[in-house]
Design a protein with these regions (language model features):
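Mature, function-bearing regions of proteins
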Residues: 84, 114-116, 122-130
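Noncatalytic modules at the cell exterior or secretory-pathway interfaces
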Residues: 41-50, 109-118
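Extracellular carbohydrate recognition and processing domains
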Residues: 16-42, 83-98
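Boundary detector for helix-to-coil junctions that initiate low-complexity/charged tails
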Residues: 125-155
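Non-cytosolic beta-sandwich-type ligand-binding/adhesion modules
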Residues: 1-28, 73-83
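Short beta-strand-plus-loop segments that form exposed binding edges in beta-rich domains
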Residues: 50-57
């Protein structure tokens, strides 16, 4: 049986993401629903893809640093994801697929020869069915919020 909590890393050095060059990150600390890890990569990496687990899930990012400095923000210039971002004090993402990923545009950041991304997050696994229903609910809520904002703007 495959361990769901294994973190898989893909490095794009200009050739895209290749399954055969991906690897499972060693040394991931898991305590309860909290994961902490360091991802080491060289300055030739353009984009780093982090697959946090092999399950639909919710991630709350507690720490996310590059070479000891907080990542600039979680906008699309730096971070792309196949999850849905939920606003809050800490970045939170809902992934309704069993292949969740965060793509870090490290080429847009100041890199050294050797670099380290440090991540700490809390997670909750869920079935893809629950994830899909939650995603549809969030889509519905976001649509309703846009309608309310448009009504308020017109007044």
């Amino acid at each position: 049986k495959e361990r769901i909590e294994r973190v898989q890393i893909y490095e794009d050095k200009g050739q895209g993401y290749l399954e055969e060059t991906s690897y499972y990150l060693p040394g991931v600390e898991i305590q309860g629903n909290r994961m902490e890890m360091d991802i080491h990569f060289d300055g030739n990496v353009k984009e780093l893809r982090i697959d946090p687990m092999h399950s639909a899930c919710i991630l709350i990012i507690k720490e996310f640093t590059l070479n000891g400095c907080p990542l600039p923000n979680y906008g699309k210039k730096y971070v792309k994801t196949n999850g849905r971002k939920i606003d809050g004090k800490e970045p939170c993402f809902v992934f309704h697929t069993a292949d969740p990923n965060l793509k870090i545009q490290v080429s847009n950041m100041p890199l050294k020869g050797e670099n380290t991304i440090h991540c700490v997050w809390e997670y909750a696994r869920m079935s893809e069915e629950i994830g899909s229903r939650l995603n549809r609910f969030l889509t519905h809520i976001n649509g309703a919020l846009k309608k309310v904002k448009n009504v308020v703007k017109r007044k």
